[in-house]
Amino acid sequence: MNDNSFNQIKLFQSLFKGREDVFAVRWEKSSKSGYMPAYNYDMYHYRAHKMNGGTFQNYPHKTYLSLTDNELQKHFIGIQQIGVYPLLQDNTSWFLVADFDKQNWKEEAVNFLNACKEENIPAY
């Protein structure tokens, strides 16, 4: 990993700090798509489970993949699309996202930024 990649990862981790024990990956199947937790599992063992009528949802031998620098690097170079889980296990969060999409979205966004500034809350 070069210095630029390292700096990208550290910037991402500082802006989008969330759970580190799990992250989401994007999936596509037919005309549907979405995000699901990234898991580590033995595909051969799972295939046997599936052949016996099991599903991935009730497959007991899967564990979450941790959000590592390597997983972030794969995201940055386009190998995978990931999402973070911002809600921590203690029901707190390090960041929030605000969506302004009505007629007066610019004014609302400026008001939001001003309110954050008044409360010393970093906003970008």
Feature map (PLM): residue ranges:
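Signature for HUH/AEP ssDNA processing cores
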Residues: N2-Y124
